[in-house]
């Protein structure tokens, strides 16, 4: 029920990469950040999996067309998923527009990059009529290197 079409591809992809049907998914994605001075997380980005320009079918096809031995169980990542709005950018580099526009947090702190002690929380879910399928959350804290 969450299958959908992705963005219009212009220029049109080569024939072997064209999709004639809904080939991606409506998956809500959020990035939250909490510094050591904060008790609650701030939402810093909200995007959607369907913003991927190249859907996973296209990525796998392109990846394997030259003979790459992709097998069951191999991990393949989509890369950064950014939406059309400023608050839907998918990486710190994009969110801060090349480190020139710091993210302002509710604590009064600013970030152009993650710092030691920062905790990042990723969330993903699909929303239906009267129900929600969550992918859980993925959380990590940056620790000092020494």
Stretches with model-predicted labels:
Residues 79:
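Aromatic-rich peripheral "rim/lid" segments of glycoside hydrolase catalytic domains that contact
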Residues 1-71, 82-146:
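Catalytic-core "active-site belt" of small-molecule-metabolizing enzymes
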Residues 73-76:
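Hydrophobic, well-ordered secondary-structure elements that form the walls
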């Amino acid at each position: 029920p969450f299958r959908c079409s992705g963005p219009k591809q212009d220029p049109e992809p080569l024939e072997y990469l064209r999709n004639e049907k809904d080939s991606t998914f409506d998956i809500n994605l959020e990035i939250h950040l909490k510094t050591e001075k904060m008790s609650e997380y701030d939402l810093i980005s909200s995007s959607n999996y369907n913003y991927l320009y190249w859907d996973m079918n296209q990525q796998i096809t392109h990846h394997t067309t030259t003979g790459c031995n992709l097998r069951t169980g191999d991990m393949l990542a989509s890369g950064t998923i950014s939406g059309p709005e400023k608050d839907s950018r998918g990486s710190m580099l994009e969110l801060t527009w090349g480190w020139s526009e710091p993210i302002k947090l509710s604590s009064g702190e600013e970030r152009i990059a993650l710092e030691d002690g920062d905790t990042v929380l990723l969330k993903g879910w699909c929303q239906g009529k009267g129900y929600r399928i969550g992918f859980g959350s993925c959380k990590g804290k940056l620790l000092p290197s020494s």
